[in-house]
Amino acid sequence: IVAIIYYISILRKAYSRLHEAMEKAEQANQLKSAFLANMSHEIRTPLNAIVGFSNMLPHVENREEMSEYADLIETNTDLLLQLINDILDLSKIEAGTFDFYPALIDVNQTLEEIEQSMQLRLRHNNVTCTFVERLPECTLYTDKNRLIQLLANFIVNAIKFTEVGTIRMGYRLLDPETIYFYVSDTGCGMSSEQCIHVFERFVKYNSFVQGTGLGLSICHTIVDRLGGKIGVESKENKGSTFWFTLPYRQN
């Protein structure tokens, strides 16, 4: 009898774990279904804008209006490329083919490249992006493209939620073995509850802002794979600071 009770207890625990796993799988499937439905809309919106303004452009004679249409095409092309890149990165993560190629890089030069790229992107916005904190010299053994992807994702996210103001980017050493990167903005900020879930997949706190809801989740994966930590500090209506740390290796 004792043996029967013991095995029944084991079966109940196994059933409970199975039921919990099935519920999580169902939630994941629902999220993926909602994601796919949302993506068809997210991709169609910039694509329609690109096609529409491209068709109108040959018939425009006013130079100022022509420049405006060209800027709109460029903006929507960047958005479409970001959407596609996020989806491709997710598929690589799921397939286990999300690769890294570390090498010794010049950190100041890399962040200056990001700053120049973002300033060009923001030339018609009421937002500035500035590289504000650095070491006189700094080399780091890491994947340059992934570092750029991390900071660019943070900055693009900040742009979405900052109508007017400043986005600041920088880095410093926390200790001899840890380097700390950050992107701060003066945007709308988030609640403490939102901060808890912001790095989860498919999370979007503003349905009017276009995107996959994958960018920050992908950042979390990159930082984890590089052996660092990631986080956010934010207050509603006060702005946000997204940050990550990496091992400070030079070989």
Model segments located where?
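Conserved catalytic submotifs in the C-terminal HATPase_c
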Residues: 101-106, 123, 128-138, 174
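Short alpha-helical Gxxx[C/S/T] motif in the catalytic ATP-binding
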Residues: 215, 219
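Short conserved segment of the HATPase_c
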Residues: 52, 190-202, 242
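Primarily the dimerization/phosphotransfer
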Residues: 17-59, 78
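Alpha-helical segment immediately C-terminal to the catalytic phospho-histidine in histidine kinases
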Residues: 50, 55-81, 109
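Helix-loop junction within the histidine kinase core
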Residues: 91-102
